[in-house]
Amino acid sequence: GIRLMTLVVYLLYAFDVINLDGMVVSLCLTYGIATVLNIIYLFSLKKISFKIQPAFVSKWLRKDFILYTLFLIATSLAGNLIPVLNTFFVSGKLGLAVAGINTIAVYIASMVEIPYRSLAAISRPQISQGMKDNNMLEVNSLTKNVSLHQFLASTFIFFLIWINIDLIYNVIPNGNVYDEAKLVVLILSIVKIINTSLNVGATILSYSKYYYYSLLFTVILTITAIYMNIKLIPLLGMEGAALASLISYIVYYIFLLTFVSWKIKVSPLSMRELYTLLIILSLFAIDWLLQTYISKYIITVFNV
């Protein structure tokens, strides 16, 4: 519901039905309505309570709860730093105008993640149950299937985006300004494909007894991202920031998946993904040949 209302607000602003102030007010109303509806729903279930019961939380439970909550907060903060870091470095080193162009590219690339949320929500309860039952054969099989389907879905969306990238920028207002970030869209889309395909490894780790290592790997991701942004943005500009994200996630998943494979004996990677990758690369090669050579030949023939 909230996504649909937000989309409507964005479209109204894009087609000049409302101005910037109207968009801000509309977004505030959208989230306000969603909050009120959630509260009403909770009261209708009669499972919400504001009564404080200190005796319910024992001393050992309180300690574990506080430590685990602090761990989750730290992990979430570190994980959400990467997009903010890129925006911060791009705007700080290249200016707000370039940051705006980069942001549009980020939004276009983020469409690759659309299937991830649904597939991840479906798979997590099954992975959690498998880890609880210590059924590693089932977990390993499920992990590989989830990774493969995430890879297929995200790559399919990326393929649709990339072969229509010029059309997308033509539709966007001032697209002739923003289309200089095409390479950023390409690199960030690859980042999204890697993240959606391999993030099931992080899910496995979070449900295991080694969950606290998640923070270590997230710190590695953050430090790598900061270092690569500092090094690459002055050299390559927006493309440097996108490349910094790509390198950071590659380093992150090398450490993460190696640890998960070593300690938990589970890996999301399989030969099926390699075969799929080869097919996808072949499709991109065909698309490149069509655009670079064959289309020019056809135009030449018809002109003659």
What are these regions (language model features)?
Residues 30, 186, 221-224, 271-304:
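Transmembrane alpha-helical segments of multi-pass transport proteins
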Residues 20-25, 60-72, 87-110, 136-141, ...:
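Interfacial/gating helices of multi-pass transporter permease domains
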